[in-house]
């Protein structure tokens, strides 16, 4: 096996499934999501002459850290994504920022074929739990003090989610602020060890921090989001940021990096605060000035937690924004319009 494809068994197995899917397709239009399904969509288009729509939730050229996880499979995922995108009838970007990234990564794409349709959420899934809802037991189980002002992070332990930067920023955050980290599913043992080391140092210095490594059941996560005071998203790569929408649907103000599609979700000064971040253009998204990014993040956290009444107003504004602009009903209508346009071109 070529050196470039070492550790690529996982990707090759995915391609095997893609071949089976492509052979069985019997549809008027194909809609594929992520590189895992892109090859199936591309092959089905060639086999059955069926128009192909792809929704871009992320881009392999902008996630070079995935090589840590996929090994040689990253070369295969990158190849599959590129070929599928360049032969698709439409590519849906989940944000305007993502559309720009798509055209940068794949300049051979016709810009007219790349359209924006945001992701959405089902608001009913994020309603305030009843007082006797068992989800509230999460606070007791993890010794989370509901009387303390509490900041919440929810995300996988990956390079793109920016958790190491948050752990650095928390050294400069008011120690009276309780911090809850729902962080698990590390991409690699290396990044898990990095996070463990940073957490241990932080816990020794400031304390008042709870790390939940397991994936919480939805009722418990919903109760946790309704029981905290603010949400933090330190991502360095985020095509849209569903996690922020979910927090807003629970009425939480959000502090988030001003990267990718996040500024299309979080309105600075209205639904929370955006943390400015200048980034390298080498695909990694690494902040050009990590110290500034860390200190600006800490400052935004301190500001939002220092004014509970303003934080509540921001949380209410965020709830209304999530409800009014990111409902699945409106997004479904926009997606159907994409299908209709593609099919009309075939007539």
Name each region found by the language model.
Residues 149, 153, 158-172:
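A conserved mid-protein helix/loop that constitutes part of the nucleotide-sugar donor-binding site
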Residues 183, 192-215, 219:
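Nucleotide-activated donor-binding/catalytic signature segment of Leloir-type glycosyltransferases, i.e.
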Residues 97, 120:
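Carbohydrate-associated surface elements
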Residues 127-144:
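A short helix/loop element that forms part of the nucleotide-sugar donor recognition site in Leloir-type
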Residues 222-228:
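Short alpha-helical donor nucleotide-sugar binding micro-motif in glycosyltransferases
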Residues 50-53, 61-83, 100:
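Nucleotide-sugar donor phosphate/pyrophosphate-binding loop at the beta->alpha transition
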Residues 253-256, 266, 273-274:
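Short hydrophobic beta-strand element within catalytic cores of glycosyltransferases
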Residues 236:
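Aromatic "clamp/platform" in nucleotide-sugar-dependent glycosyltransferases that forms part
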């Amino acid at each position: 096996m070529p050196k470039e494809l070492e550790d690529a068994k996982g990707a090759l197995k995915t391609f095997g499934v893609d071949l089976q899917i492509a052979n069985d397709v019997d549809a008027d239009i194909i809609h594929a999501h992520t590189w895992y399904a892109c090859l199936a969509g591309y092959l089905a288009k060639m086999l059955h002459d069926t128009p192909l729509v792809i929704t871009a939730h992320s881009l392999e050229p902008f996630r070079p850290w995935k090589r840590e996880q996929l090994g040689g499979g990253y070369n295969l995922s990158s190849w599959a994504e590129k070929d599928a995108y360049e032969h698709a009838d439409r590519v849906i970007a989940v944000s305007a920022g993502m559309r720009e990234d798509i055209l940068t990564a794949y300049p051979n794409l016709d810009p007219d074929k790349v359209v924006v349709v945001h992701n959405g959420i089902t608001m009913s899934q994020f309603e305030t739990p009843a007082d006797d809802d068992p989800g509230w037991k999460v606070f007791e189980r993890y010794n989370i003090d509901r009387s303390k002002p509490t900041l919440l992070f929810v995300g996988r332990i990956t390079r793109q989610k920016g958790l190491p930067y948050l752990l650095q920023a928390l050294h400069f955050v008011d120690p009276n602020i309780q911090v809850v980290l729902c962080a698990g599913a590390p991409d690699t043992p290396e990044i898990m060890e990095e996070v463990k080391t940073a957490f241990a140092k932080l816990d020794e210095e400031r304390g008042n921090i709870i790390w939940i490594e397991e994936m919480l059941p939805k009722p418990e996560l919903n109760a946790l989001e309704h029981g905290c005071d603010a949400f933090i998203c330190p991502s360095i790569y985020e095509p849209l940021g569903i996690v922020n929408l979910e927090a807003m649907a629970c009425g939480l103000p959000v502090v988030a990096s001003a990267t990718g599609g996040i500024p299309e979700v979080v309105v600075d000064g209205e639904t929370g605060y955006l943390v400015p971040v200048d980034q390298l253009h080498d695909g990694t998204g690494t902040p050009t000035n990590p110290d500034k990014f860390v200190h600006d993040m800490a400052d935004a956290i301190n500001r939002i937690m220092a004014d509970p009444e303003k934080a509540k107003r921001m949380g209410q504004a965020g709830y209304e924004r999530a409800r009014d602009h990111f409902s699945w009903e409106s997004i479904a209508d926009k997606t159907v319009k994409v299908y209709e346009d593609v099919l009309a071109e075939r007539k």
